[in-house]
Amino acid sequence: MELNKDPGRLRNYKLLNNVYGSSKSEIEKNLTTINTKYGNIIFNKCNNAAENLKKALDEVWIASCDDAKINNFVMPISGTYNYRVIQDTGMLSPHSYGIAIDLNRNDADYWKWVPREKGDSRIAIYPKVIVESFEKYGFVWGGKWSHFDILHFEYKPEIIIKAQHFFEDDKNEAWDYNIPKDDKNIEIINLINEKIN
């Protein structure tokens, strides 16, 4: 992993508040429980977050039928919704919005717990199918951050959509060309462009 590169780790709290809820009570009204092969999971239903989490986990489950070791990286799930501040930052965790999931915890999963080399070793054995399934459904992976958080997946479809655009051969279209242009989406697209550009 490259030093001081944290793709998708930056958070736009104005966007998060607008899309997922701007207070604990507002966020909690947006939470739903999804039933998965890994158990019942509480997640935010806005912006199709819960629906896409279910799709990602269903896809991982199917892959685990061919490789049972995959589930060792998933179960038990360490957590989703937890209204809290990130230590030493004063900023809300994405778990506070119900848009992040921590899969099965390993002592080498977090940059504050172990040296970089141990994190790199853990990333090297992490099943690609888990990462690919989550990214396919709009999640960024904390294992791609130099401040690694390997068990962490965070729902940020706007980042995935924009990243895919910049890796496609034809960049003539705007990154948001296939997103319906209702008032809410236009407001969110403008926020994203303002923060990323």
Predicted regions located by residue number:
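Cell-envelope/glycan interface and biosynthesis
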Residues: 1-144
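Low-complexity, Gly/Ser/Thr/Pro-rich intrinsically disordered linker/tail segments
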Residues: 136, 149-197
